[in-house]
Amino acid sequence: MTTPTEFQFTDYQPYDFANRRHIGPSPAEMTDMLKVIGYNSLDGLIDATLPPSIRQKAPLVWGAPMTEREALDKLRETANKNKVLVSLIGQGYYGTITPPVIQRNILENPAWYTAYTPYQPEISQGRLEALLNYQTMICDLTGLDVANASLLDEATAAAEGMAIAERVAKSKAKAFFVDADCHPQTIALIRTRAEPLGWSVIVGNPVTDLDPVDVFGAIFQYPGTHGHVHDFTGLISRLHQTGAIAIVAADILALTLLKSPGEMGADIAVGSSQRFGVPVGYGGPHAAYMSVKDAIKRSMPGRLVGVSVDARGNRAYRLSLQTREQHIRREKATSNICTAQVLLAVMASMYAVFHGPKGIKAIAQQVHQKAVLMAKGLEKLGYKVEPETFFDTITVDVGHMQGLILRAAVAEGVNLRKVGETKIGMSLDERTRPATLEAVWRAFGGNFTIADFEPSYRLPKGLLRTSDYLTHPIFHMNRAESEMTRYIRRLSDRDLALDRSMIPLGSCTMKLNATAEMLPITWPEFSDIHPFVPADQALGYREMIDDLIEKLCAVTGYDAFSMQPNSGAQGEYAGLLTIRNYHIANGDGHRDVCLIPTSAHGTNPASAQMVGMKVVVVKVRENGDIDLDDFRAKAEQHAANLACCMITYPSTHGVFEETVKEICDLVHEHGGQVYLDGANMNAMVGLSRPGDIGSDVSHLNLHKTFCIPHGGGGPGMGPIGVKAHLAPYLPGHPETDGRPGAVSAAAFGSASILPISWSYCLMMGGEGLTQATKVAILNANYIAARLRGAYDVLYKSETGRVAHECIIDTRPLVDSSGVTVDDVAKRLIDCGFHAPTMSWPVAGTLMIEPTESETKAELDRFCEAILAIREEARAIEDGRMDKVNNPLKNAPHTVEDLVGEWDRPYSREQACFPPGAFRVDKYWSPVNRVDNVYGDRNLICTCPPVESYAEAAE
């Protein structure tokens, strides 16, 4: 017992975020782990892992790290510098109400936001069902056959639609028509996408300016950005007569009242599902949608959820038609799309489940009535309202009074849209209140109330919707919140996310997404800011973004950043466009060759072809390093036309290559630029800077290295950093600087999730970030050491070390026991783990990345599980287990297996409780192994009829 005279102050820091919360192993555990690897100190391990030539000279420093409370106070102080006005700017972004049951149980629930892309279907059945609901919702509303599981934003989806049109159109034309009534950011992105590919873009009035003979496709906005609602049936028919493709960019809320694009004959529909319960968030993240006719489904980009069966014949969901994606087809892929917007798509689908078709239609009717009331008030003041028929958006010509009225509206707390030099536009939404209408009328000089007018309709009668939508029973469930809460919980219980166990996916960096980092994204000062508000209303955002850019520059050694790309793949695309525009500005527009090693991520070659570059593949040596001789030969061979090379560092094999600076020098000697893929930046922060070792541009995956959660497959952020000579060629945006080259619908991409990365930097500090990198390397080397002897670690440095991930070789098991990498992955589910990355970058292997956030206990549990799997394979080799009927081949095992008739030559205990599995709180796979072949041969991408569920249960 301590007496007062013995009292001493402790030096323990309970609120040290970096060392007490974010980094998993304790100092004592690190010492034990280092002994297993064979080192006395963490710095000794780091010195042996990183080549001295790439180490940064000065430590990463930017002030003392903050506690969680201090960081939240700083975020609050910054957020309060934003002005939250009512924004009626529209232009694809609208006020919406997020049902609290969805906000609390999905957006704020780590079971949903910490999951990974559902490549392992057995442990992803919950979000796959939610995404199937989303696809069904989109197909119903747009009247088309197949929808994907979301894209990055509406403008990107429109550009992707154009690319599909060029690919599948029978027309040989090389021009694309864009309705001038499309949103300006959509037009800008289409121009960006078309120019490097040699396609011309014609912007005009489709009634007077469209000649179908001249184009391979056309896109129409429905309703238009200024409110016009046109019937495009005749124009679409004319396009089809010449073999061209018709795309309609449609507002899904309007589609509850208006004729669908499919009924007009459209081939493709695109748009945003932001109106379905997702805040505007200064531009994102939001889930864009795309739906297509059945005939062109294989050309559609992005994830596609389909229905299949499991080993018992029960219904199961999976990602379908994956062979068309970038990780398979590389430069021949339909798109470079990798990350989508799964979390936001889930929210939108749940909004439809929450309200049902009657509720959503009622919301649309109320929005329209508000717009009509607004128009009546302005007409009473003597203004001519355009158009005559509309859904939610109207425009008035106010002449020289434009500036005065806009300022008066701001004084009333309302943002209106500046249209040209004499007009003002306004878009009404779900959140518009009567007081808002009255405030706008006052800004126009009126002094009356909403009670002075009778509600009525001004929708075009010939376009009123008569077809049904959202007919599946899931959209007609009991709307009591208790039922909604339980439905969301049931789905999340089917999934395996970071809230249950580590997700050791190589090249994915599934680290902690701390609760303190997540809290600010729902604050209205961040979530309720329209992306096109006047600059003085977003000063907090700009302060945060500028400081984050300063920190990212310090981390990378670059001189400037663009925060516009809203995924890693978009970052690659933006970086390559920057290089291309730099060459053109210097009179080197002929430089179009991009050197890419065979080990590169599939997005690299896919991104290169999107900017019109020719991919030249470079060999990789047996040890995983780039073949320097082959690289040199190809750089010399293509010197006259060399635009750039794309490399990943550390390499995709998880090793710091010694020759990286030499590779960069070679490219520069031959007139090219170096693109260093930042996917593996978690092994470099604080230890090595891309800008110091010869790279000219990189993207950073903020959803990896800087703690934005993966959301089950999105959102993400992929900002690009560049050296000073490339800074003038970074993406512009029509709503900010007016420069060309926009790559995202909003100038700062998915800005509302940037507080996550900023607060991570504030709480870690430079020293904490550096320590996190060291521990990420420690954890990977610890796993490699623990698995030594059971599995070969394929790639190591000359000192025998790996970087932040390691690749273990499971190929020998195929010959010795018949056990495949799939079997190992599915058996890990029985142990309660998501499998590591399978068969990439080497087929038949597993790439393991534990990150710095996992404790020694969790690392040991994983090692015990995968070592036990090796012993099960050994039992097959020795004849102690059947080669076909064994726990590996039958994995994953379900509760149905446990309680059903048991006729297997191994026990229930062996099946369901292998080493590593929890006995209490065990994760049970909801389905047995999913049949991938069946799913692709019998493609169903919408909710099956309710009778089929009964059939599957029989």
Swiss-Prot record:
It holds the Pfam family GDC-P. GO terms for cellular component: cytosol; glycine cleavage complex. The modification N6-(pyridoxal phosphate)lysine is found at K704. It catalyses: N(6)-[(R)-lipoyl]-L-lysyl-[glycine-cleavage complex H protein] + glycine + H(+) = N(6)-[(R)-S(8)-aminomethyldihydrolipoyl]-L-lysyl-[glycine-cleavage complex H protein] + CO2. Keywords: Oxidoreductase, Pyridoxal phosphate. Transmembrane segments: none annotated. The keyword Oxidoreductase applies. One of its GO terms (molecular function) is glycine binding. GO terms for biological process: glycine decarboxylation via glycine cleavage system. The keyword Oxidoreductase applies. Its cofactor is pyridoxal 5'-phosphate. Its EC number is 1.4.4.2. HAMAP family: GcvP (MF_00711). Belongs to the GcvP family. The glycine cleavage system is composed of four proteins: P, T, L and H. The glycine cleavage system catalyzes the degradation of glycine. The P protein binds the alpha-amino group of glycine through its pyridoxal phosphate cofactor; CO(2) is released and the remaining methylamine moiety is then transferred to the lipoamide cofactor of the H protein. This is Glycine dehydrogenase (decarboxylating).
